[in-house]
């Protein structure tokens, strides 16, 4: 029986060089746990935050990053009744007592944590399902039950943004996106965007109004903050909402409340969003993921193109994450 496994560990947070490939004892199932053998491991933004030690939900050091793993059930602990050896599953750290843990060849988790995967979803595609879950939640929370005809998705070729584009198109919405390169523009259009415009915040509202007969969009999804959040607000239709789901560029220099007041006749709103809203609502959180699995299995949404790297190249993968230039999903192969 194998006694050791490979994993990626962070002892001293920092840049990509902080990621160390180590050998650790093979995890042993406790009662009520299953051991999952990894086939594909997703690499994304939360992993970078664990690596550099700034994640709000930081696991204790030494920490194993990784928030999504797809693989097969390899062993059962005493008392397990709901899963079987050989079943294909997705492990999301949103379902675990602490975040991280997926940059490893094996992981032991409570039997009620994994999601069973249909054969129609490849392992390397399954690690993008968390972005479908998040995008669904944002669309549902978006406009307070008001009808949504159109949305604005800056950076429409990004991981979460690609899923927003597809879900909105699936529901018959007009999707205006922005993209910074011809390749990203083609990617967004291929995944359901109705139109792609220049993303420069200075002229973004005018470009949106030109495509919507002067009306604007019902929802605008901002992942940057700074001047882009202001541009999203200014691009809204009456009763529209700008949703801030990240703040990579820092807060805007302008007073957001005064910006809303200056557009008072349109009755606009700004909503922040985090998937951690559902940390205490297991039933809804899991329902969103089960819905995401169904949508991908049915072909209503597609996983983005994947780039697969051996676990030995994890530092290079994180350099690519830091640069933000990669198109599609970065995936680690444990073997």
What are the residue ranges of the model-derived segments?
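Glycine-rich phosphate-binding loop and adjacent beta-alpha segment
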Residues: 227-300, 334-335
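Short glycine-centered segments of the SAM/dcSAM-binding site in methyltransferase folds
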Residues: 88, 150, 174, 240-241, ...
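NAD(P)H dinucleotide-binding glycine-rich loop of Rossmann-like/cofactor-binding domains
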Residues: 82, 92-155
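Short amphipathic alpha-helix with an adjacent loop that forms part of the alpha/beta core around
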Residues: 203-214
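Glycine-rich beta-strand-centered segment in the early N-terminal region that forms part
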Residues: 25-43, 54-95
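C-terminal hydrophobic helical "lid"/dimerization subdomain
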Residues: 2-3, 281-335
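N-terminal Rossmann-like NAD(P) cofactor-binding module of classical short-chain dehydrogenase/reductase
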Residues: 90, 220-221
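Mid-domain Rossmann-like dinucleotide-binding core that forms the NAD(H)/NADP(H) cofactor-binding site
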Residues: 126-201
């Amino acid at each position: 029986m194998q006694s050791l496994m490979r994993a990626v560990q962070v002892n001293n947070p920092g840049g990509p060089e902080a990621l160390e490939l180590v050998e650790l004892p093979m995890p042993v199932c406790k009662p009520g746990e299953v051991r999952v053998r990894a086939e594909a491991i997703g690499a994304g933004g939360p992993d970078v935050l664990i690596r550099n030690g700034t994640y709000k939900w930081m696991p204790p050091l030494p920490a194993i990053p990784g928030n999504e793993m797809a693989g097969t059930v390899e062993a059962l602990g005493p008392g397990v009744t709901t899963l079987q050896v050989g079943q294909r599953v997705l492990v999301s750290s949103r379902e675990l007592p602490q975040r991280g843990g997926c940059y490893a060849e094996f992981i032991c988790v409570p039997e009620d944590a994994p999601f069973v995967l249909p054969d129609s979803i490849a392992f390397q595609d399954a690690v993008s399902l968390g972005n479908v879950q998040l995008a669904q939640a944002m669309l549902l929370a978006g406009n307070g039950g008001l009808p949504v005809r159109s949305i604005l998705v800056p950076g429409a070729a990004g991981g979460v943004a690609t899923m927003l584009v597809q879900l909105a198109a699936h529901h018959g919405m007009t999707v205006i996106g922005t993209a910074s390169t011809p390749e990203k523009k083609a990617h967004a259009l291929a995944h359901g965007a109705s139109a792609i415009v220049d993303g420069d915040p200075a002229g973004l509202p005018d470009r949106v109004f030109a495509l919507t007969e002067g009306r604007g969009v019902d929802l605008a999804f901002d992942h940057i903050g700074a001047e882009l959040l202001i541009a999203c607000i200014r691009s809204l239709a009456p009763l529209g909402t700008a949703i801030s789901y990240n703040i990579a560029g820092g807060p805007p220099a302008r007073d957001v409340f005064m910006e809303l007041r200056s557009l008072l006749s349109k009755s606009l709103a700004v909503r922040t969003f985090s998937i951690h809203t559902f940390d205490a609502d297991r039933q809804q959180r899991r329902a969103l993921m089960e819905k995401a699995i169904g949508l991908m299995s049915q072909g209503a949404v597609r996983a983005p193109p994947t780039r697969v790297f051996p676990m030995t190249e994890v530092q290079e993968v994180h350099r690519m994450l830091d640069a933000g230039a990669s198109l599609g999903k970065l995936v680690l192969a444990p073997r």
